[in-house]
From Swiss-Prot:
Pfam families: Phospholip_A2_1
PANTHER family noted in UniProt: BASIC PHOSPHOLIPASE A2 PA-11-LIKE (PTHR11716:SF101), PHOSPHOLIPASE A2 FAMILY MEMBER (PTHR11716)
Name used for this protein in its record: Basic phospholipase A2 homolog Tpu-K49a
Classification lineage: Eukaryota, Metazoa, Chordata, Craniata, Vertebrata
Residues at the site labelled Cationic membrane-docking site (MDoS): K128, K133
Length: 138
């Protein structure tokens, strides 16, 4: 199980508190975060921002934009406080910088849930070869 969460780093590059982000996605979607989102589309994974292919890919794109706005953080090492209450993610972090990080991760997890109907299994493992390099502005 520990390996699964460590591998979750592939989700949106090396962004987000890996364990917490993976748990949020699992809680919101019920899906394995690595299998379903680790290499999805043109934006889920370690590459930079690209033009999103669909709504799910746009979730990853927006998450990268959200993280781009954060300053003075180490998204791999930094951990924040959150809980799962009444089927909702609640960011409880007092530190403003860590709270922002939590809100970025919460937003992508909710975005994945809200776009499950349009999830395209063909994009689950996208090699990114045909992704357009010019992204939309954040």
């Amino acid at each position: 199980m520990r390996t699964l969460w460590i591998m979750a780093v592939l989700l949106v590059g090396v962004e987000g508190s890996v364990i917490q982000l993976g748990k949020m996605i699992l809680q919101e979607t019920g899906k394995n975060p690595v299998k379903y989102y680790g290499a999805y589309g043109c934006n889920c994974g370690p590459l930079g921002r690209r033009k999103p292919l669909d709504a799910t890919d746009r979730c990853c794109y927006m998450h990268k934009c959200c993280y781009k706005k954060l300053t003075d953080s180490n998204p791999i090492k930094d951990r924040y406080s959150y809980s799962w209450e009444n089927k909702a993610i609640v960011c409880k972090e007092k530190n403003p910088r860590l709270k922002e990080m939590c809100e970025c991760d919460k937003a992508v997890a909710i975005c994945f849930r809200e776009n499950m109907r349009t999830y395209n299994k063909k994009e689950r493992i996208n090699t990114k070869i045909f992704c357009k390099k010019t992204p939309e502005p954040c």
